[in-house]
Curated annotation (Swiss-Prot):
Domain of life of the organism encoding this protein: Bacteria
Residues annotated as signal peptide: none
GO BP of this protein: iron-sulfur cluster assembly
A Pfam family the protein falls into: Fe-S_assembly
Protein name (record): Protein IscX
The family this protein is said to belong to: Belongs to the IscX family.
Subunit structure comment from the entry: Monomer.
Biological classification of the source: Bacteria, Pseudomonadati, Pseudomonadota, Gammaproteobacteria, Enterobacterales
Amino acid sequence: MGLKWTDSREIGEALYDAYPDIDPKTVRFTDMHQWICALEDFDDDPQASNEKILEAILLVWLDEAE
């Protein structure tokens, strides 16, 4: 079962694991969207995201990075 846009915690943790040297505070949503869609376990419609979803994922990633 793949990751969906609603899995913000799991996606944020996966981004932290996949990009350990990236400071999430410097990431643009457009880049983050591409990285999420490229995650091996991601299995959802790339067009189904929105700013609120990306913000939730970013907050998890920031939390993991601290």
